Amino acid sequence: MFRIGQGFDVHQLTEGRPLIIGGIEIPYEKGLLGHSDADVLLHTVADACLGAAGEGDIGKHFPDTDPEFKDADSFKLLQHVWNIVKEKGYVLGNIDCTIIAQKPKMAPHIDAMRKRIAEGLEADVSQVNVKATTTEKLGFTGRAEGIAAQATVLIQKA
């Protein structure tokens, strides 16, 4: 049996925080605002996995009203999500992710992100694709006010 999940997330850029995307710290003058470390890509991946497994979303599992998740490492949240998926008897087929950001440039960090996501999903890096695009300076991402990400995941019974 195959199941497909889709994830989407957005975070505002702000001063005074590190920029962590896909589990990788990226040198930049701003970081993403959020209750956890605000890793927009790992949140998207986690949401896609939860959706595919029929287990809701990250807000259900890690509410931003719970102090336990204040400044949480999103990689640890992803590992927790993947354990839920595994307990239901699924393995990763593949995942395709898109980061939507005007800046900074993501290309130098894509390979490291793929490896980190593969690690979190206990998969081979060949099963993980990450790409980035801009919105040609249109909208909040185009004005560099925030960063968005989306992902589609395929899981299958082990």
Swiss-Prot record:
It is an enzyme of class 4 (lyase). SUPFAM superfamilies: IpsF-like. Its EC number is 4.6.1.12. Pathway: Isoprenoid biosynthesis; isopentenyl diphosphate biosynthesis via DXP pathway; isopentenyl diphosphate from 1-deoxy-D-xylulose 5-phosphate: step 4/6. This is 2-C-methyl-D-erythritol 2,4-cyclodiphosphate synthase. One of its GO terms (biological process) is isopentenyl diphosphate biosynthetic process, methylerythritol 4-phosphate pathway. PROSITE patterns: ISPF (PS01350). InterPro entries: MECDP_synthase, MECDP_synthase_CS, MECDP_synthase_sf. HAMAP family: IspF. It comes from the Bacteria. Binds 1 divalent metal cation per subunit. 4-CDP-2-C-methyl-D-erythritol 2-phosphate binds at residues 9-11, 35-36, 57-59, 62-66, 101-107, 133-136, 140, 143.
